[in-house]
């Protein structure tokens, strides 16, 4: 990072006159990073950014040097970086989930195994609180190589227009049949009371994520499911077929827009905001944002013009909902950049300290008196200004948000909508979110690293075509056979080979632990007997 401080030049001049033993007495170690640039070259380059940088360095005890990578070609940037062994950063920030490039590099020893470090709560009080289930998706060959940028595990679910439901006398849906009845009523029973047939129950665009959520209601799992000791892709289960048959009925009965496959993803949620749809199946914070829109744009309830329209952030249906991977992006510690264990500890300490409360405030809100002020009741009040001009712009890309803000120190006063979302996560979605048991094994599969995108696309397109009636059951089966022949069967074999090895290791660990406990019990009994004899 190019930082131009007048003081730096003065310090350098003074250092030249000091004794060698004193010259570097206060010099901080440097941590180097590769970070994606989302802000057109403005990240940590705005007015006031130098102050932000200095605050980070003073707080963490480390200087830091960032190479910003073009987000539009970031995968290529990472690939090039991994080949430049002489200029390797200590920390590489990655987006999304692991791909073949990262897996291949990990298998060649490009990254440190962080398993033991992330168990050390004394050295890393924040990072050690990471959800161990989430780490399974960042594991290659039994080694945890990534630190996740945490996202809510129970983020997906079902939300709907509460005032529409009230007008039509509908209760809270619990079963799949309840959902169908609500979709039907929202489509055909004039929920907005305008005497015009202009609504569809379920909002849909070409983004098909809602279908994955619906599938969990039927018990078919999340991508893969464990059956009889084997991991099986969900499209090979009876429950999957039941789920897409139900979705086909929803489509055939006109309960979603007939042209949903042509509606661009950028329009997602606009149907609910504009009063064209009443059910939103996606991230729960998306339902909250629709509710925010109603409040901010004075959209009135259809049952009470003195109140705003509202969304019920329900969450699961039939006691289930889809889990996220638990993260969106991650950090790698490279073996060529962090050459020693001391380097690894420095890199992890830097990342850990960035998750302290003061650093979260700096990353999220910037400088007090410049971009925010504290209110008398201890809440943050932001100061108006262009987000792209904020001095902290881009700093949040280095924050894992583990464990995030303490519940008793939330910087923004929660609204009714915020409280409803928190309640949904804590009491409803998080406890029942269905995880993908194959997540860790997919990242280590050679077939998936090469052909995963194509294989996923075959299944997704076949599902869409079947729901819309473009293909029949035979066409659906043909697509599944195509999936199997183009690498699907190999993928199943690789995933289950890794799964079986993992199960054997876990069983061996359990046996060792049991033997250790038994030996300790016998030793204690022997000591007690000896003591009594004496």
Predicted feature descriptions by range:
Residues 7-8, 21-178, 212-213, 223-226, ...:
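Conserved N-terminal structural module of periplasmic/extracytoplasmic solute-binding proteins
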Residues 10-18:
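Hydrophobic core
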Residues 1-9:
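Positively charged n-region of N-terminal signal peptides that target proteins for export
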Residues 37-48, 52-56, 154, 166-172, ...:
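Extracytoplasmic/periplasmic substrate-binding proteins
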Residues 36, 349-465, 470:
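Conserved small-residue motifs centered on glycine
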Residues 89-93, 278-283:
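Paired acidic/hydrophobic, glycine-rich loop segments that form the ligand-binding mouth/hinge
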